[in-house]
Amino acid sequence: MLRRNLLLSPLALCLPSVLAQAKGKRAVVVYFSWYDNTFQERIRPSDIDETTSASLKAPGQVALVAHWIGKDLGLPIYPIVVKDRYTTIYEDCLDRVIEEKTERVFPELTGPTALPEFDLLFLGFPNWSYTIPRALWSFLSKVQTANKTIAPFCVHGTGGLARTIRDLKSAAPEARLTRTLSIDRSELAESRKRALDWAQNIYFG
């Protein structure tokens, strides 16, 4: 059926999702963002200051990149969501993040509840206290990543990637990691093309 559709519709050859299916590529986009893990309806304008900036504005910085990639490649997109949501107050949120990191907490998750079979996982996250959010440890502990490929993308501030990739390798030791897409949040608005070039090179490579 796929072969017939491609023959009948030459324009379909231009669609990344169709090309991916033709190559047998199985991939998903999964991400963690602060915005998706707060009670959005409780966010007040006074909560959004220079520090929180776009992190608390819909759809969130990491989510924005995830949707760029997912929509461009025709992939399903899943947010990682914790059961116990985070506060919108930056300093209080940071205190909890540091505590979770120090105590090596595995936060309980409410999503994603299930994923389709995949060979390639685009995994997005912020730099949280110089490492990956502990929710990623929870997610990766429940997902089969042995012999899978993880393509990490991180939106960060002046701390850069810090220990995020080192700790990601520890959380998924049997996975293959691609080159990381690192985006400074101050350059996010101009980063769409770079993000898509990165994703397409991995996806169709």
Give each language-model segment a name.
Residues 18-205:
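Active-site-proximal alpha-helix that buttresses catalytic centers in soluble enzyme cores
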Residues 3-22:
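N-terminal export signals
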